[in-house]
């Protein structure tokens, strides 16, 4: 059985990792051992943050809706309860967008929520 030399495969594997670590600071972009750890950790951060992004955006939308609802004389929880009673099915993403860019439309929606609460 002939001797197996793995130089080509090792070089290919190293190049792949170092390419992924391009732009990292110092040894993290140059030294294979360090770069490999950095790439693995980066992947863990990516995985975690793809899930956190959804939570963070929802929290941002709620904060914006709350601020706009309070300007119109209603708290966030009462506003959402009013929307449910009025059978208005607009998601928080769209409500937050309306609160920021279409203030008159948002005010009209708040009024409908107030009417359904009364």
UniProtKB/Swiss-Prot annotation:
The protein's matches in SUPFAM superfamilies, at most eight in alphabetical order, are given as: Ribosomal protein L20
Identify the keywords attached in UniProt to this record, alphabetized: Ribonucleoprotein, Ribosomal protein, RNA-binding, rRNA-binding
* Record flagged with keyword RNA-binding: yes
**Highest taxon listed in the record's lineage:** Bacteria
MF (Gene Ontology): rRNA binding; structural constituent of ribosome
Q: Name one GO cellular component term.
A: ribosome
**Per its database record, what is this protein's job?**
Binds directly to 23S ribosomal RNA and is necessary for the in vitro assembly process of the 50S ribosomal subunit. It is not involved in the protein synthesizing functions of that subunit.
Q: Which NCBIfam families match?
A: rplT_bact
Record-given protein name: Large ribosomal subunit protein bL20
Source organism of this protein record: Marinomonas sp. (strain MWYL1)
């Amino acid at each position: 059985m002939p001797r197996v030399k793995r130089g080509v495969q090792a070089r290919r594997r190293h190049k792949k990792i170092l390419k992924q670590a391009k732009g990292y600071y110092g040894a993290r972009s140059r030294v294979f051992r360090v770069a490999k750890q950095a790439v693995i950790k980066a992947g863990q951060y990516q995985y975690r943050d793809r899930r956190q992004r959804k939570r963070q955006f929802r929290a941002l939308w709620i904060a914006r809706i709350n601020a706009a609802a309070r300007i119109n004389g209603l708290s966030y929880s009462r506003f959402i309860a009013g929307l449910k009673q009025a059978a208005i099915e607009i998601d928080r993403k769209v409500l937050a967008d309306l609160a920021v860019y279409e203030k008159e439309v948002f005010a009209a929606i708040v009024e409908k929520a107030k009417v359904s609460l009364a």
